[in-house]
A protein has these predicted regions:
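Short, conserved charged micro-motifs
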Residues: 47-54, 108-112
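"Short basic amphipathic alpha-helical interaction patches in structured regions
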Residues: 112-118
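Polyanion/phosphate-binding surface patch
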Residues: 29-32, 36-41, 63-109
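Short alpha-helical segments and helix-capping/turn motifs at coil-helix boundaries
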Residues: 20-27, 84-85, 118-120
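Short Gly/aromatic-enriched secondary-structure transition segments
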Residues: 55-59
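Conserved small/polar residues in nucleotide/adenosyl-binding loops
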Residues: 138-140
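Long, contiguous binding/interaction regions
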Residues: 118-126, 131-133
Length: 140
C-alpha cells in the first residue's frame, strides 16, 4: 500500500499541466521493453494427475533437472521454489503451475525465442519423467 503524498500539491488549472504531469512518468521510447509470462500445469502422462512437490517425478525433480540448462535454484529452506537465469525466472505458483517470467527484451522476436527455448527445455525434462504440461496463459 502506498502512503499519502507529503503535500497536496497545487491544483491543476490547465490541460497542459495535466499532460506535463502524465508525461513526466513515461518511460523514454528507447527504454521500452517487452516481458513474457507463460504458465503451465505439470501432470503425469500415465494417470493425468497433478504432481506432488517431492518424489521421482515431482515438481522438485523437474526444477532440479532444469538446472542443466544453466538455471540457478532459488531456495526456501532446503526446497527449490524457483529458478533464475539471465533476467528470467521460473517460479512455482500456488496451484502447482510453473510460470516463466521472461527478461525485459527489446523485440517480440526475442520473446518468441525465449519462450521456444523454455518450452524445449521443459519438454525435454518432461519426456524423461513422463510428464506433460497443460498450458494455461500466454501474456505478452
Amino acid at each position: 500500500m502506498s502512503r499519502p503524498p507529503d503535500s497536496e500539491g497545487e491544483p491543476i488549472e490547465d490541460k497542459s499541466q495535466l499532460i506535463e504531469d502524465l508525461e513526466s512518468g513515461c518511460t523514454p521510447r528507447e527504454n521500452w521493453r517487452i516481458g513474457t509470462e507463460h504458465e503451465k500445469f505439470p501432470f503425469r502422462l500415465s494417470d493425468h494427475k497433478r504432481l506432488p512437490y517431492e518424489g521421482p517425478d515431482g515438481i522438485s525433480e523437474i526444477l532440479s533437472r532444469l538446472t542443466r540448462f544453466g538455471w540457478q535454484p532459488v531456495k526456501e529452506r532446503d526446497n527449490t521454489i524457483a529458478l533464475s537465469l539471465e533476467g528470467c525466472a521460473i517460479t512455482l505458483e500456488p496451484g502447482g503451475q510453473f510460470e516463466l517470467s521472461g527478461a525485459p527484451l527489446e523485440t517480440i522476436h526475442q520473446t518468441c525465442d525465449e519462450v521456444h527455448t523454455h518450452l524445449a527445455q521443459v519438454k525435454e525434462v518432461g519426456e524423461e519423467l513422463g510428464i506433460g504440461m497443460l498450458l494455461s496463459l500466454i501474456h505478452i
